[in-house]
């Protein structure tokens, strides 16, 4: 993490996106040092069940996703007992980024999950959201990203996202910026709670050029939070050149939008 701070301090970037929950994906198979919720007594699961060697042998899809999940997360996690140490670490990160002049775009939900956090019921989701917003909203540099790739939550209807957004808006007296990010299907960014469009390319050719369509359609700032990553991975989302990502930055910029860089070497 210190290397990340050093890199940010030497760069011109002034916003970073990061997840509240740990991430389960190819190249992210180690167990986190802490968990966001307390483990129940007599839990049928333990961290040793997710040893890296076991996960490396699990089946994966063409995008790098790996099939693994706690069978009954409600029997493992006490969703009414957030882990204070876990959230203190996030809070310290937000505060430190603020001293560097960097915006902290917090991703509240994501589907890359083996622990079951993406499967919380609506009551559990909104308890978690109240805790997070109450704890972090006082920081001037916080943004709320309702989800990364919301449409990969195949089991979660739009009504739940709207309920989540209502909770965030109600709990946040400072009206921080709010968005929701897509994979292949765009969210309706005309919704009143959305302050800006957080977008991923949905056209493999017009990766950023569609800003000229989205800006007049939604009448809101358009941030290309995912236009693929500069890197050398064997996946199409993570192997474009530095020259190509530079071009993809200029495409939205000249149309009144914004781009975000990511490296996957």
Residue ranges and their predicted role:
Residues 102, 173-175, 191-265:
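Catalytic-core region of carbohydrate-active enzymes that cleave or remodel glycosidic bonds
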Residues 1-207:
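Active-site mouth of glycoside hydrolases
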């Amino acid at each position: 993490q210190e290397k990340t701070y050093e890199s940010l301090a030497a760069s011109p970037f002034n916003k970073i996106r990061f997840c509240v929950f740990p991430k389960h994906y190819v190249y992210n198979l180690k167990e986190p040092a802490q968990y966001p919720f307390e483990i129940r007594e007599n839990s049928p699961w333990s961290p040793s069940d997710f040893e890296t060697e076991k996960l490396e042998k699990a089946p994966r899809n063409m995008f790098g996703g790996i099939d693994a999940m706690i069978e009954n997360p409600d029997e493992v996690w006490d969703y009414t007992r957030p882990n204070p140490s876990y959230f203190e670490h996030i809070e310290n990160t937000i505060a430190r980024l603020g001293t560097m002049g960097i915006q902290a775009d917090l991703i509240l939900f994501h589907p890359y999950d083996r622990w079951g956090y993406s499967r919380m019921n609506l009551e559990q989701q909104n308890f978690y959201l109240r805790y997070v917003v109450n704890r972090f909203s006082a920081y001037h540099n916080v943004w709320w990203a309702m989800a990364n790739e919301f449409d990969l939550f195949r089991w979660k209807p739009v009504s739940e996202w709207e309920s989540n957004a209502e909770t965030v808006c109600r709990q946040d007296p400072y009206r921080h910026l709010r968005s929701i990010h897509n994979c292949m299907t765009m969210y309706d960014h005309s919704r009143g709670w959305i302050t800006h469009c957080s977008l991923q390319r949905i056209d493999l050719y017009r990766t950023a050029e569609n800003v000229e369509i989205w800006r007049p359609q939604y009448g809101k700032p358009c941030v290309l939070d995912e236009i693929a990553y500069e890197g050398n991975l064997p996946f199409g989302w993570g192997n474009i050149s530095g020259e190509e990502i530079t071009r993809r930055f200029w495409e939205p910029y000249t149309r009144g939008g914004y781009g975000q860089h990511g490296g996957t070497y």
